[in-house]
């Protein structure tokens, strides 16, 4: 309701508006046909196009190391998409994961309100302190990103989306995230709880 009200205020009856940017939510494009919407979207993506400097990474952690075995015991393995190891290897991306995690509602719903950034020396302690479901991903600083065996397609999609946004940022200090009250409201909204339960089956 608040979002719809905000959109209405922003438009203010202007019938010429065909693009609406919703902070931390996405973009709404209006058009007389699907082709018109597609054309507008292409113009937007062309203007915002930027080079991505990150590439595939592989982890250096040996499978017979105690840390690797500990991760396996908890149900984790190296993530399937090697690009996503950068989230645990590149300082700028680690900072995004740590400080700008709650970028948009779906991300919080499917991946939680904060990320688990693993420490090589304290990983066992970190995992033992979790009193709820284990997180779908662990970002082991300087090593790589690990996925839990129960991770769903929806959760993979959300992390890929986060990565696509993160690698295109020049100054993360300017990035707005969802507030604590917005996150609380979101995670306790019955409709979102139901939607998340459906996604876990995919």
Range-by-range predicted roles:
Residues 1-202:
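Glycine-rich flexible loops
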